[in-house]
């Protein structure tokens, strides 16, 4: 946590978070009673100025947001120390105050659907796919592969062409439905605008019962293939925890599991615009994709790299198979673990890094798929209930 050190006052140390909770200190900063030269370091005083600006707005500010703001201020200070080439900015003060206010307004302007998605607590280890309606009714779907289809007005929902559910829709009130797909199951959803989404195992999709007049927006945690109905006047937005994708009409795969360190987007056809953070505090970065490309966004370094790929290698899970091209055993195990809802343990990090290429038929069991891999790699399997252990094959003698 950033510490603000004041000269005098027996070397008392003020932490940055104290600025948010100490109204008297905030008022002193606002009214100029604490002078800049009372702080040991100009940069840290500026951090206090930024926190003061947040406090003066009197907007509720959660602990996670405080910590995120603290860390991003520290990062910006360190970058400024390393590189003082901002000729267009009059001083470090104006630079960092601008940075802080930009962060503050970014943090407090998350979309309604993101805020709503954060309240959903359904787990991915359930035995059922859960359809959560806006009226708090929850429908449990037992099928391993299920289909959900909405009518144009969002009031009628068909489930696997057998069950029909009706819900009330109020024209002027935004209401959301949520589908939570557990590990071991998949779901196909046709939304009220006729866009189709294939949700992979362990995924959550939040979407409006009926889209607003000016925007189509959904929230994804997990992996899904989107076939978006074209509508140039109403762009389709997919929001994740770390990225937003804007499309007009296209087919793409988005893999954004919370426990993964990267967000992968593969564009099969059409055009999308990626909106993401890239180590910059002056707003998000935007980058367009063309068909046949994979965009990998590294959440740790906030960097995005694109490369040309065979898109079928990334979308084939929808059709019941996987195509591996020098994929690590560790990444394959994670995919299979989610798909089949089994635990897969690999003996060592070294073994997890070995690669495999080939075709995997997902109509077979997890053990059968891994057995095929073991025939082509120097590994052996041990299975107990829903746990599969992979280890290096022991040589006789």
Label every PLM stretch briefly:
Residues 82-91, 97-397:
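A residue-level detector for the "anchor" residue at the start of short, highly conserved motifs
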Residues 1-12, 16, 26-124:
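Membrane-interface anchoring determinants
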């Amino acid at each position: 946590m950033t510490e603000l050190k004041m000269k005098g006052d027996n070397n008392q140390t003020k932490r940055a978070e104290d600025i948010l909770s100490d109204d008297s200190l905030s008022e002193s900063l606002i009214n100029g009673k604490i002078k800049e030269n009372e702080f040991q370091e100009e940069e840290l005083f500026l951090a206090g100025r930024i926190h003061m600006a947040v406090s003066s707005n009197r907007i509720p500010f959660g602990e996670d947001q405080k910590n995120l703001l603290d860390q991003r201020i520290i990062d910006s200070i360190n970058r400024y120390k390393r590189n003082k080439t901002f000729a267009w900015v009059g001083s470090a003060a104006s630079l960092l105050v601008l940075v802080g206010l930009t962060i503050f307004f970014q943090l407090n302007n998350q979309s309604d659907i993101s805020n709503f998605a954060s309240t959903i607590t359904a787990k991915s280890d359930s035995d059922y796919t859960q359809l959560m309606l806006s009226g708090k009714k929850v429908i449990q779907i037992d099928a391993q592969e299920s289909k959900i289809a909405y009518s144009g007005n969002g009031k009628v929902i068909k489930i696997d062409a057998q069950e029909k559910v009706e819900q009330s829709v109020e024209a002027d009130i935004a209401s959301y439905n949520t589908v939570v797909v557990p590990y071991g199951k998949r779901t196909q959803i046709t939304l009220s605008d006729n866009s189709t989404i294939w949700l992979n195992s362990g995924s959550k999709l939040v979407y409006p019962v009926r889209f607003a007049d000016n925007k189509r927006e959904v929230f994804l945690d997990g992996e899904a293939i989107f076939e978006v109905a074209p509508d140039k006047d109403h762009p389709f937005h997919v929001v994740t925890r770390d990225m937003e994708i804007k499309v007009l009409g296209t087919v793409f795969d988005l893999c954004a599991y919370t426990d993964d360190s990267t967000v992968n987007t593969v564009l099969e056809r059409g055009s999308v615009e990626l909106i993401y953070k890239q180590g910059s505090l002056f707003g998000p970065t935007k980058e367009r994709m063309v068909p046949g490309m994979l965009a990998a966004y590294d959440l740790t370094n906030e960097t995005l790299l694109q490369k040309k790929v065979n898109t079928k290698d990334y979308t084939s899970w929808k059709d019941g198979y996987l195509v591996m091209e020098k994929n690590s055993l560790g990444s394959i195990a994670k995919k299979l673990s989610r798909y089949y809802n089994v635990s897969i343990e690999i003996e060592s990090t070294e073994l997890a890094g070995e690669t495999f290429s080939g075709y995997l038929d997902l109509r077979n069991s997890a053990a059968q798929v891994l057995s095929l891999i073991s025939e082509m790699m120097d590994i052996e399997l041990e299975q107990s209930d829903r746990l599969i252990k992979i280890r290096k094959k022991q040589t006789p003698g």
